[in-house]
UniProtKB/Swiss-Prot annotation:
Domain notes: Forms a beta-barrel structure that accommodates the hydrophobic ligand in its interior.
UniProt-annotated location(s): Cytoplasm
Name this protein carries in UniProt: Fatty acid-binding protein, intestinal
Keyword Cytoplasm: yes
Induction: By EGF.
Cellular component terms per the entry's GO annotation: apical cortex; cytosol; microvillus; nucleus
Residues with N-acetylalanine modification: 2
Length: 132
């Protein structure tokens, strides 16, 4: 599938403001700006495996489209939600378990880049990845 590859973060847009809105402290925000995040995505039918490798952690997340699961962000924020495939976009709809606020994510291939867009409490950010 189109998402299957290893992707390395190339640049970010408004990521610091997004993390600030999420409640991430300034020290962690500065570190996260240089996390060298790499995603290895594989899809088998409705099942996705995403291996995240960064300065902070290495984890593997396995999910099925439309099936609710729990996920922890690098700063420890706990989320619960689902991914769905709408056209050529992976749509993530999550709620924080601590306050119930929504975090929505879209992953899409634009040209030769993977663009991951986040929206939380009206603040939008993007992280743009290139194939590694």
């Amino acid at each position: 599938m189109a998402f299957d590859s290893t992707w390395k973060v190339d640049r970010s847009e408004n990521y610091d403001k997004f993390m600030e809105k999420m409640g991430v402290n300034i020290v962690k925000r500065k570190l996260a700006a240089h996390d060298n995040l790499k995603l290895t995505i594989t899809q088998e039918g409705n099942k996705f495996t995403v291996k995240e490798s960064s300065t902070f952690r290495n984890i593997e997340v396995v999910f099925e489209l439309g099936v609710t699961f729990n996920y922890n962000l690098a700063d420890g924020t706990e989320l619960r939600g689902t991914w769905s495939l709408e056209g050529n976009k992976l749509i993530g709809k999550f709620k924080r378990t601590d306050n119930g606020n929504e975090l929505n994510t879209v992953r899409e291939i634009i040209g030769d880049e993977l663009v991951q867009t986040y929206v939380y409490e009206g603040v939008e950010a993007k992280r743009i990845f290139k194939k590694d």
